[in-house]
Amino acid sequence: MAQPQLYLPEPFKIAYRKVGQCRRFQQLKKKNGSFKRKGIERWHRAVSTNLLKQNVLVPKEESSSDSDMGFHESQQNQKSNLKTKVKTAFGRMLSYKYRSKPACASQEGSTDHKEALLSNTQSLLPRIVKEFSSPKLFTAKMRKLSENATIQLDVVEAETEEITQGNTLLRARRTTKRLSVTSLPSGLQKGPYSPKKRPHFPALKKKKRGMENILRKSDLTVGKLQMQVDDLIETVTDKSMKLLAQRHAELQQCEFLGDEILQSSKQFQRISKRTMRKYKLKNMTTKGPGDS
């Protein structure tokens, strides 16, 4: 048995050759830069003229002009869709406004209103633009706001020099700044200004606590305060009496010590006198009468 030989039909060979020619042609054209779009390159590479015989669907040839036209058409469609959406929104708003009116009109009037709304939806935008306020009002407001106030700044510098005992020169410079409003726009007035004195050392300054705040915070009454004052007076008098007694005892002790010192000094004087007499007598006896 002879084995069946596989062979390609003639039209397929022709189609294959022509596809190869198309590919070569496309590569040359790509080098020259005539085909710029990937979609066109894809179709030109895959499409051949004799593929219709093999029951293959061939897409239509697209050109750059056709694609551009399609892009413009899509943009126009988007614009028209936006316009229709805006018109429907305004139509709903106006229809809601007319619904809120009292339902005392007849059916003929309602049908007339509906027809008028449907006919006037196309001219809604220009009417709404006409209803806006004129630009003259905005310019007047801007003119009013454009009036500015003038402010004057005064800067004063004071410098003092002083020579100390060590022949050192001390210099002190002080600058003061003051703002003043000279002119104001129409419709505005100056408010009262009270400058606050700033303390030189705010950290060292003690906070003054008023008696009223203390009384408000604590539950003190006049009777309780009087009792506390009486207790304080009693304690002060007791302590002062004790101190006076202590001082009196100290004075008495000092007097006693003084008396003892006087007595001891008198005794010392007596003893010293006796010793002097004895010394003189001894001297007299040692010399004798012959020595004279």
UniProtKB/Swiss-Prot annotation:
InterPro entries given in the database record: C3orf49-like
Region described as Disordered: 62-81
Protein name, entry field: Putative uncharacterized protein C3orf49
Organism name: Homo sapiens
Gene name linked to the record: C3orf49
